């Protein structure tokens, strides 16, 4: 189904289902003998959403060999491995910001992210989660039913990031006069190019000097029409459909040229340092990523930025 500027979703459909897919990957990774991440809430949240395919993956009932094409460059197991290092990257970003004295954290498009419940935040930290109202309500109710307690002053901010969300954030208690740590994890591909620019402008306007931003860039902006990338994704998701999970990830992304995020932010007063997925995998002694089209493999897709 084609995207529209005002489409909405729950956690079992459309863009919302990608949040559940990511949570299932975290749950699966947390079950490893020597896990790189600890997310005790991922599995019960995925169970509560009720998508059978994702529940089976999260709980270990479904084996990668049953789903992934052994000759394909990318699949469910590969995605889960890359999600592990992505999660570690953003976890460490928040921990580093807290150690530096930043006491406001903002999770943009939080989905089933449970960092407000599982990270060891300093006692005076406020964590803001911004996402669609139905997503936030579902997560809050599910975690309350589990008896989970936030590890910070957790504020839910129901808003659509494609539109006017800064006012909602301020109403939630955000103080633009104090530094903040922001993350945009797995978000930009699901925003139209102009909405990506507006979001970065809003973050800049709301950020006091010393604020930090970590983001995952959408590398498909200039290469999105690459038949090789599209075929890689569609080959992987073909196995999902055979197991009853119909999610066209490729169709959920917005096409069109985009600003390169680090250059855009550098022009707005941020200092940026980039990292590739390959570097993150190597840092944890994990297998290298599959071969990507020329021009993609060496482009950083993770950026940590400091204002001022």
Curated annotation (Swiss-Prot):
Annotated binding of S-adenosyl-L-methionine, by residue: 131, 160-161
Report the sequence similarity comment from the record: Belongs to the UPF0677 family.
Q: Which UniProt keywords apply?
A: Methyltransferase, S-adenosyl-L-methionine, Transferase
Protein species of origin: Mycobacterium tuberculosis (strain ATCC 25177 / H37Ra)
The record's listing under PANTHER family reads: S-ADENOSYL-L-METHIONINE-DEPENDENT METHYLTRANSFERASE YKTD-RELATED, S-ADENOSYL-L-METHIONINE-DEPENDENT METHYLTRANSFERASES SUPERFAMILY PROTEIN
Q: From the UniProt record, which GO molecular function terms apply?
A: methyltransferase activity
Name of the protein in its database record: Putative S-adenosyl-L-methionine-dependent methyltransferase MRA_3827
Q: List the disulfide bonds.
A: none
- Role according to the record: Exhibits S-adenosyl-L-methionine-dependent methyltransferase activity.
Q: Which domain of life is it from?
A: Bacteria
List the EC numbers from the record. 2.1.1.-
